[in-house]
């Protein structure tokens, strides 16, 4: 691993029960880009071929507010499960509270490279000011499982959580 350490290292293991769960931007653009790529439709900027990442400046500005973080490369649910496992916590996601996905499949598709992070709720206003494209998508729980709730409050089940190379 290469890189320069900022003042504080944000690990996957830092999530605490009650923390808010955020993503830095909408999900599904990687999947849409891949579908266009397969059909040789290359007329628009393609998030699959050239993901737009957060700037170092933005990440440094968010750093004081984050308790844990991971990039969403293998699917939101799988990458969230990695934070939960490392933190020995669980999560509840409310997927239809805000329009951060186009379809349910966007939760497991991957290749989005948005930042998934947790933060104490007292920082919500600062996060919105620092990263206006972010979405508050759920809460970290003490119970070690992940629940995904639809707008009626029903728990959704998934056969797979995302892309697993192993």
What is the meaning of each model-derived region?
Residues 1-166:
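Helix-biased detector of long, well-ordered alpha-helical tracts
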């Amino acid at each position: 691993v290469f890189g320069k350490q900022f003042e504080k290292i944000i690990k996957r293991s830092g999530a605490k029960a009650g923390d808010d769960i955020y993503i830095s931007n909408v999900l599904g653009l990687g999947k849409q880009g891949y579908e266009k790529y397969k059909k040789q439709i290359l007329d628009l900027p393609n998030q699959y071929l050239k993901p737009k990442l957060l700037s170092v400046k933005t990440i440094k500005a968010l750093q004081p507010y984050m308790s844990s973080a991971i990039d969403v490369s293998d699917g939101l649910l799988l990458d969230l499960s990695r934070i939960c496992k490392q933190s020995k916590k669980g999560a509840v996601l409310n997927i239809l509270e805000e329009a951060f996905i186009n379809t349910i499949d966007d939760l497991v598709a991957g290749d989005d490279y948005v930042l998934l992070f947790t933060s104490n709720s007292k920082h919500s206003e600062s996060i919105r000011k620092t990263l206006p494209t972010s979405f508050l998508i759920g809460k970290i729980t003490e119970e070690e499982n992940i629940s995904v709730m639809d707008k009626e409050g029903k728990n959704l089940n998934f056969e797979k959580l995302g892309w697993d190379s192993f």
